[in-house]
Amino acid sequence: CLYVRFGSFTNFLWFQDTLDRWGGDIRNLVAQRGISYGLNQRTQKQLVLQQSALGRLFGEAAVADAAIVGSDMFLPEGAAMGLLFQARNSLLFGSDVQRQRREALKQNPTAREEQVTIQDRKVSFLSSADGIIRSYYVADGDFHFVTNSRHLAERFLQVSKGQGALGASQEFRHARAQMPLDRKDTVFAYLSDAMFRNMAGPAYRIETTRRLQAAADIELAQLALLASATEGSPGDNLQQLVQGGFLPPDFGQRPDGSQTILGDHGIHDSVRGARGFFTPVPDVEVRAVTPSEAAAYARFSAYYLAKWGKIDPIMAGLRRELLDGGKRERVFVDVQMSPLNSQTYNFLASKLGRPDQVQLAPVRGDALSFDVILHQQRLFGGFRDFGPPTDAAGEGLLAAVGLLPFGRLRDFLYGYVGTVDGSLGLLDFLNRRIVTPPDAQGYSATQREIWRRQYDRFTVYSLHYEILAEVTPQLRFEPAPRPAQFRLRVGDISENRMAPLANRWLFTRSRETSLGNLRLIHAMMQQLHVPGEDAKAAAETVLDGTLVCPLGGEYAYRKSAQGGGWWTSTALEQTGARSTPPPNFQAPPLSWFRGLDLDAILTPSRLSAHAEVDMQLPK
């Protein structure tokens, strides 16, 4: 299973707050996305577990520990997952859970609560007709489990009887030996081999394929409903949409007998419910398969066994500490695949050399540097902190980031690469192009000005003579905190001299994303003839998400004097057509990333990485 333990209620709140800070999508750390699926909010709504101000205040007094348990990670469609709490005060915690469930019943007329029997126990099951609420609540002593999956509720009760506990497995005991409790991780995550095998099994795989088809059918039906409404055609049911030519004649025919339904609660699947809140995969019984499904699974299974064979258990530990008076946070992350199967180890070991516990000392002026020990070579390199050429702005933004002839591209390849102790390996293709003998200081070059310098133990190449002159005297080894075969160091990119150009490029990307959302809304108005004020909501219904302006603005409908109107973003109204960001704009990761140190090691028993990330906390 998937197991994520927090160790305390405070850590659990930090995890939730971090997700909320980035719109519930960790990918927003790299670049702001144009659509939010609100996955964290969806999960809380479905489980009927909302964090209140009072709960935050007294949560630590009521909850000793918390964990996420699941059997897959299909969050956009609806994952099989639950929240497990160890209560300090079971009466207080249980009362709060029951209070939230009573409030949900009052607020949702279609919601109902029933007592279902699971493992000879009465379990509270709260559900709504559209599947948006689906919550099993069961307690055993001080352990309280809230889940959207009957299968997981059953597993919880089985474990309470001592049957099939994760903690009893040899793999998990090995994981905890590698990452023991005394590390005091903020978050500990474990993905077992059994979870991967279960997800690759026939029932799970086939139902996963079916639910993807069900989601596609719902989206198609929503588009058909919009088209019929704007054309004034009947659209009270799917049959009318088929007769009107908005859906194909064979629409909705699926092997398991499920179908798309257009009813009082919108468009949903007859077996799985509303899109984004689908019934968890393990709760949908696969009773029979078609020949085409069997053939498709056979192809998948053959590919899986040939390419993956066995996915090793994955464990991760995350710890954090505040820096700079609470203005920054350093996050320590350890990730391991262990135990490592021989096939994976042999493949990687054939590429890598033996780990050692020395590293290249930081080179002054490097924005990024790496060091990797290969089979017969130690390769290192760096990218220097430099300002863009003074005429880069005149070349246009795409030209400025490197889409130029070689004569200008070299101005942006401002770095170096080298090796140690004469073994050229991958760099031999550069060495063969050297046409001049080394001078007294070890410099030589090709006809196209690729420079090489042989300095002490090091052989270093660059497109720039001055880089070799700056870097090579600084090259030396120093003790490393851990043995490793790969090391990566990245400085504070917000202070990099290339940061303004990077911010400009990221602003342009974000601006295009915002404009892309507006084009979609415009298409709703022009092609489907959706009324202007309703066009954004219609687009969000089709996408099953919320359109977000990555520039930080809000989408707004503006009416014209002639009676029409258009959609725009308040941020775009302020910036206009300019391609340069406003003074207060700082795109991710420039807004938060302040440094990274990473190292990785391969041994016969494990593949592991350790990273330390410095993050700027929002004001």
Positions of predicted regions on the chain:
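Signature of soluble extracytoplasmic/periplasmic domains of secreted precursors
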Residues: C1-K619
